[in-house]
Curated annotation (Swiss-Prot):
The gene is CIAPIN1. [4Fe-4S] cluster binds at residues 209, 212, 220, 223. [2Fe-2S] cluster binds at residues 172, 181, 184, 186. This is Anamorsin homolog. GO terms for cellular component: mitochondrial intermembrane space. Residues 130-161 are annotated as: Linker. It comes from Drosophila simulans.
Amino acid sequence: MENFKGLQKSLYIWTDSADLDKRVEQLKAATGGDVALENVHRLSFSSYANSSFDLIVIECAQLTDSYVKLLHMLKPSGKLHLVSFIGPAASLLQEIKLSGFINCREDSPDALTAEKPGYETGSSARLSFAKKNANAVNVWKISGDDEELIDEEELLDEEDKQKPDPAGLRVCSTTGKRKACKNCSCGLAEELETEKQSQKATENAKSSCGNCYLGDAFRCSTCPYLGMPAFKPGEKVQLADNLLKSDI
């Protein structure tokens, strides 16, 4: 009991009333404070407020369901002392630990002591972490002023803006170029020959009346440019394929 000197308020839980007054006086002398009494069989019906006692002493008792209740009844850093307990010390120590007590120890073959943590059950505390680096936080901030926008017009050259000539898109499946191979079977040779004949006929086409470029209203019935839009004098015009073939 020497370790309990200076504790102001204690609770003595008893089972045998024999020499009860003597044991209470010994506890008062050891603590120097007030001592309240409670029978072990009436403990579950008691209505003690939380954090009421600095020390709870139990003699000749084995409590299996009341250790949590005793934990609430003790003040923060309060002590629980079991004397002449019933049962193996190892089992009691494990049960007390699982109820929330700390620093559980066996003082002697017939005495155990445990403590309540230095804070109230259900209390909270502010965690003190290192201060955040303001520069580290700003790394993840996106500012519109810092964005470098790319001019869409700079992505394309003048050559990219020009539409490709559909006539020059098809290539030979063998050579990969717009030039027919020797044994062409994909039809590119015939297509190139037709374009060649069309170009030659266009170059040889001449106007007998001199009014072909003005449009159909000024063209004769056999004009090779019949049905085509008007064009400038001297402008190179490609005739349609059906005008290069015989009607017979």
